[in-house]
Amino acid sequence: MKKLTALMIALGFAGVTQAATISGTVEVDITENSSNDYISTESIKFDIAGDSGVAFGSIKVETNASDQFVLDEYSIGANITETASVSYGEQSDIFIGGGLEVVGSNTIANPSDAGESIIANIGALSLRGKFTDTDTDISDFDTIQAKWTTSVDKFSVGASVDHTIATDDNIYAGSVAFAVNESANLSTVVTHDASQTDEVAYESILSLGSLSAYVDGDEADWSKNVGAGYKSTWKDLGYYVEANYNLDSEEVTPAAGVSVSF
């Protein structure tokens, strides 16, 4: 609550709230748990975002498992130039990822993004420093991330690294995407994590409009999982249906969800 109040005050002084946009969604997701039972997860999310041209900020509030409203993410920052900005808050990481709405991202590395951080964007380069604990020492960083992306004609390429300061460990990721046409896209993410037994892993996704399909694996088994999903909207209603199939265990993991935006 203290962080939420402080952020609202900061946004007000920055003039961001004068042009704030408030949006929300009601979501219902159906997934299969470890006991092979289908469970339903309901959530309500609110997003308040504003940009005064110089200062910007956002607040995301959602319901938890106890049906309590909690602060999910927040950020406040400044646009230094047209291509450079800096922000602080509980923000998502910048590491290259994959997967669909729920399924996917089975084999590729996915460093934890939990915690407050500072993010700087300078053109095609993004830098993120995640704090260990801002309540005890705001000068102590846990991890440093960097990401670079660019596009050439129909190709988009990217590279990122996650560095853990205490252990000096690095996790690397690279991506390439090819826009076949306006509705078809083929992308591949490759990661390297020396802390894993199988250090190199990949995921390739083919998207055709609302339909997506993927295959993934690692250096021990280059074809571990396949999956597919369909995601679309109808007026203010969004919905998705997808499933993952493990080629070794022959286990199917389905997921589905609907959301209403307001």
Question: In which residue ranges do the predicted regions lie?
Answer:
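Outer-membrane beta-barrel proteins
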Residues: 32-38, 63-64, 76, 106-108, ...
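Residues that define the transmembrane beta-barrel architecture of outer-membrane proteins
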Residues: 36-44, 68-74, 110-116, 123, ...
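Gram-negative bacterial Sec-dependent N-terminal signal peptides
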Residues: 1-22
